[in-house]
Amino acid sequence: MNPYVLMILMSSLGLGTTLTFSSSHWILAWMGLEINTLAIVPLMAQQHHPRAVEATTKYFLIQAAAAAMILFTSTTNAWISGQWDVTGMPGPATSTAMMFALALKIGLAPMHFWLPEVLQGLDLLTGLILSTWQKLAPMALIIQTTQTTDPLILTSLGIASSLIGGWSGLNQTQLRKILAYSSIAHMGWMIIVIQYAPQLTLIALGTYIFMTSAAFLTLKVLSATKINTLTTTWPKSPILAAIATLVMLSLGGLPPLTGFMPKWLILQELTKQDLPATATIMALTALLSLFFYLRLCHAMTLTTSPNTINSAPHWRVQTTQNSLPLTISVTVTMGLLPLTPAILMLTT
């Protein structure tokens, strides 16, 4: 892609998200979401591969439907209440419809079906943008509209996303689909606590972005898209395979890695709110996600020669990619747990 075109598209991504962040009017927030969608569509379709074009078409149709629903709901709310304020959704019908539209935007269960299929058709870097940056603007709107939304709906969305994200990832062999279901499960953890402690949602979102960035960038360096290609990574690059293993375990939420921090804080908050059943269900759904991360770790570290492998080994060539983003994201993914008290002080 032409570097000038790429610069314009990336600037538009930043502009759309910033516009949604800073707006208190539904029309401006909607415009920011649409700028985001229109900016990422050319990035998704740049490969000119049938799978990429199919994924782009699916993404565009789903996002257009969600945007139409947001515009319709905000207009209906303005007609009923006489205000366009983002935080002013007094009616249960409009607030529920808006929550489902935003859930469709970010791929929360049960509106999640498009996300694995779209992510599977993209290359890893575009998939990284879709899994991280594109979640920011809708999540900002969800945080602002939470106070007027029925708590039962938020709890149901959170449990369903965590459960489906863990359960559906168990039988996957494609790494991008596994990361898509991982994204759905992490979004469930954010939604479950958003009504009680929005600052914990922000912490969970931040750690998720760093962990997912580390996972995508590591797989990009390893040129891995399926589980059976991970089996040759240890002989090819032992250090990178060890780093990738720790990143996956961090995504699974094992201590003493960063991924344990949001799960620990969220379970603690749910227990404080006298919701032991919800906390227990969320802790059990985390085990489902942990299982398929352990599958990836097993493929990378324990399935080495002379064992039988089902994929041809790759030549080990010197990478020309910039390793700074990978280094930063891996460092944050592994070492943020001791800073938990400081992070809590900064966000509360």
UniProtKB/Swiss-Prot annotation:
Its main location: mitochondrion. It is a multi-pass membrane protein. GO terms for molecular function: NADH dehydrogenase (ubiquinone) activity. The keyword Phosphoprotein does not apply. One of its GO terms (cellular component) is respiratory chain complex I. GO terms for biological process: mitochondrial electron transport, NADH to ubiquinone; mitochondrial respiratory chain complex I assembly. It is an enzyme of class 7 (translocase). Core subunit of the mitochondrial membrane respiratory chain NADH dehydrogenase (Complex I) which catalyzes electron transfer from NADH through the respiratory chain, using ubiquinone as an electron acceptor. Essential for the catalytic activity and assembly of complex I. Core subunit of respiratory chain NADH dehydrogenase (Complex I) which is composed of 45 different subunits. This is NADH-ubiquinone oxidoreductase chain 2. It comes from Danio rerio (Zebrafish). The gene is mt-nd2.
